[in-house]
From Swiss-Prot:
GO-annotated biological processes: tyrosyl-tRNA aminoacylation
Residue ranges of the TM segments: none
Protein name, as recorded: Tyrosine--tRNA ligase
Disulfide bonds: none
Function: Catalyzes the attachment of tyrosine to tRNA(Tyr) in a two-step reaction: tyrosine is first activated by ATP to form Tyr-AMP and then transferred to the acceptor end of tRNA(Tyr).
Organism: Saccharolobus islandicus (strain M.14.25 / Kamchatka #1) (Sulfolobus islandicus)
Keyword Oxidoreductase attached: no
Amino acid sequence: MSIDQRLQLITRNAAEIITIDELRKKLESEEKLKGYIGFEPSGLFHIGWLIWTQKVKDLVEAGVNMTLLRATWHAWINDKLGGDLSLIKMAADYTVEVIKNYGVDTTKLNIVDADDMVKEKDYWALVIKVAKNSSLARIKRALTIMGRRAEEAEIDASKLIYPAMQVSDIFYLDLDIALGGTDQRKAHMLARDVAEKMGKKKIVSIHTPLLVGLQGGQRMSITEGMEEDDIQAEIKMSKSKPESAIFVSDSREDVERKIMGAYCPKGVAENNPILQILKYIIFPRYNFVKIERDIRYGGDVEFKDYEELERAYIEGKIHPMDLKKATARRLNEILEPIRKSLERKPEFEEMIQKISKSVTR
């Protein structure tokens, strides 16, 4: 695979690359690059997470040595799953199982547990050094990476450790690339700034889009005055709002019901969850999407790329109901092997039930 091909694969469907020039230089160096994503095991896996899962797959195929960090301690600090570490660890196992059955070759991943990292004194020395090189105001602004606002630091002081831990994860693993949703931008920018002060390697940040919730992306009064990445974090698909999300364990019928009830105004592409599912989840997996229609309405039509489909939708050539049916059909094809894998393992079925009762924001 050429450098241009690797670059195209790594950057496709990314919301932001900081910076593209640095990424190209790293690829041109011909050194084996190391990347990572850390995930909080915080509940059921919804399809929004498939966006970064696909990007992990892309990076592995592009020859990047990827680390998957099971951020169990981070989830505990963030009060996920009631702060029950045993349940958090179960959720981590479940997440890795989903990633594997999505099609990521987990044998090529370096899977690291935060539990192991926090046992190392060198790790905590890094956390302190990062904190010493960061202002309190900067740390508080970065709390949105946890899905929290700056004022929520008053809940308990451990919340203030979280951003320094995330930056320390990056330095401890000696990474070239950090992958995350756009909601992780503040942590990655903090890491880049602190790297210069501490003489550490400056990461390239790859930010994937956040899938909007099924209710759509109508701007709420709560988002007034917020930065764009924080606004997207507010309207994203969330496991704490089950009817706004599609979970990988949902039945075929539930997927169809949720898709058919989703926000999808005729001719409108902005913050349209159905179009986003097609763009970020379905088209990266399939060469085409077929819209089945009655012959009276023009008959079946196939689209070989997302841009062509979006244009047709904006121009009113595709009806929302036809779009939804095609989306549900393709999405269920992607989810079927994941569902079957979870069904074959009773421990995961039991885990899903426990997690469903314990999900927190």
